[in-house]
């Protein structure tokens, strides 16, 4: 609950101006509620209008994206880039291609990205972008033409010292490659750091593909060790999603001794009591681009349920939501608790509703918020930029070790900040406070014209 008068006033004004952007308002309210103890100690923030500036993007770019489909018909989509905050570094955040993309969702993601990037300790500001284009069902040539058209407008607003996009939902190595090629063509320059998630032959980083999923498990493992004197060993894990984050969270959790029993897509989920056959899922999703229901057709004992929201009714020790925002509501959270779940760490962005988070906290569930637990992807993007700047490549083991260190550091920064805020063990409060303080200090130092 917001009790600080300054923060209440800021939020009420924001609510009036952004009434049609519920995801953005939800993300802002969570942060403002968490940072109240910090703001109370810094009355100078109000005088400088710090919070008002922090919740307003520095810049939002909206543009049309015309492209020609294989039938020769002109199609038009809408493109966006939300450049939210550059106090601690160039804007950094992914590009999402999905029919659900709108300005409100990208503002929510860009706002979250500010604090996530801050927690990594790397010099990266916050941003997000994308389009309502749906790459599913499109040919490679259609995707290429769209990406080239998208970058033909976006290129003038980005660069390795200005704004460095990356992939997200609907934007993988193929799309990043097409956009990088068009940027290079338009600028006549090879700026490796202008986008991350590149192929290994032209400036990409080893371990980038695995980073978000691996990082989620490194964060969870450190939280288990330090807060519960426990580990993944012997635990049953429920994972939602079957994209990049889910696949590599499944891989690392299994390596750490857990048994992952579910994966899902937008149509439903599969339950395999023997443990998910990850090699099959990788082939299904990364090569054949099939649906998860095919898993149950080829694996004895596995069952498919045509309702992805029911994945949270499966008994487990640890839940790792890796699909999309607000996928766990109050009822799903209650089902998790009832069925023995004691740990929820988020691989997707804001996958739990505020009501679900209340259920976790009131039942003693160890809760790792997305801005802390899924920061591995952007952390390794930052490491990719570092390699590009140094004109060299690190080994998989070097990158993985740095990722592990960053994720363990994020846990400890979040935990220590939760103690300082008087909410020991509440990693949501801790992550928000730790991420906020670094950005706030930088903004104050750079003057109010910033």
Give each language-model segment a name.
Residues 98, 117-233:
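Glycine/serine-rich phosphate-binding loop and adjoining beta1-alpha1 elements at the start
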Residues 268-367, 372:
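Rossmann-like adenosine-cofactor binding region
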Residues 22-25, 43-48, 121, 158-167, ...:
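Flexible, glycine/charged-enriched surface loops at secondary-structure junctions
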Residues 162-166, 190-194, 239, 262-265, ...:
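General beta-strand structural signal in soluble alpha/beta enzymes
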Residues 44-73:
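Structured beta-strand/loop patches that form or line metal/cofactor-binding pockets in enzymes
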Residues 199, 204-313:
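Glycine-rich phosphate/diphosphate-binding loop of Rossmann-like nucleotide-binding domains
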Residues 2-27, 223-224, 337-450:
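Adenosine-phosphate binding glycine-rich loop
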């Amino acid at each position: 609950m917001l009790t600080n008068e300054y923060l209440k006033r800021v939020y009420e004004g924001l609510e009036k101006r952004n009434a049609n952007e519920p995801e953005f308002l939800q993300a802002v309210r969570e942060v403002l509620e968490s940072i109240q103890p910090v703001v109370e100690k810094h009355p100078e923030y109000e005088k400088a209008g710090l919070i008002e500036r922090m919740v307003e993007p520095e810049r939002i770019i909206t543009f049309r994206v015309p492209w020609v489909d294989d039938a020769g018909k002109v199609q038009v989509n809408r493109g966006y880039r939300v450049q939210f905050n550059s106090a601690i570094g160039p804007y950094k955040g992914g590009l999402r291609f999905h029919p659900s993309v709108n300005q409100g969702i990208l503002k929510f993601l860009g706002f979250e990205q500010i604090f996530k990037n801050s927690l990594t300790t790397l010099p990266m500001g916050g941003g997000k972008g994308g389009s309502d284009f749906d790459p599913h069902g499109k040919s490679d040539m259609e995707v290429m033409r769209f990406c080239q058209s998208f970058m033909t407008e976006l290129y003038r607003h980005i660069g390795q010292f200005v704004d460095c996009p990356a992939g997200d939902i609907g934007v993988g190595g193929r799309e990043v490659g097409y956009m990088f090629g068009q940027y290079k063509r338009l600028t006549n320059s090879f700026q490796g750091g202008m986008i991350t998630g590149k192929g290994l032959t032209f400036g990409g980083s080893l371990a980038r593909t695995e980073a978000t999923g691996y990082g989620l498990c490194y964060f969870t493992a450190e939280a288990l060790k330090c807060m519960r004197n426990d580990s993944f060993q012997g635990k049953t894990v429920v994972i939602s999603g079957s994209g990049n984050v889910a696949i590599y969270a499944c891989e690392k959790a299994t390596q750490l001794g857990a048994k992952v029993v579910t994966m899902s897509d937008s149509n439903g989920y599969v339950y395999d009591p023997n443990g998910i056959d990850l090699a099959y899922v990788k082939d299904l999703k990364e090569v054949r681009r099939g649906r998860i229901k095919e898993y149950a057709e080829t694996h004895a004992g596995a069952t498919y349920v045509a309702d992805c929201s029911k994945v949270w009714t499966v008994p487990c020790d640890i839940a790792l939501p890796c699909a999309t925002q607000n996928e766990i509501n109050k009822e799903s959270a209650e089902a998790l608790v009832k069925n023995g779940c004691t740990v929820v760490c988020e691989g997707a962005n804001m996958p739990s509703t505020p009501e679900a988070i209340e259920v976790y906290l009131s039942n003693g569930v160890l809760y790792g918020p997305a801005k802390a637990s899924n920061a591995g992807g952007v952390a390794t993007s930052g490491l990719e930029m570092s390699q590009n700047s140094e004109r060299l490549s690190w080994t998989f083991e070097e990158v993985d070790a740095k990722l592990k260190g960053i994720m363990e550091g994020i846990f400890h920064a979040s935990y220590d900040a939760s103690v300082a805020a008087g909410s020991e063990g509440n990693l949501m409060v801790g992550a928000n406070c730790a991420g906020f303080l670094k950005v706030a200090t930088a903004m104050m130092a750079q003057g109010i014209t910033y």
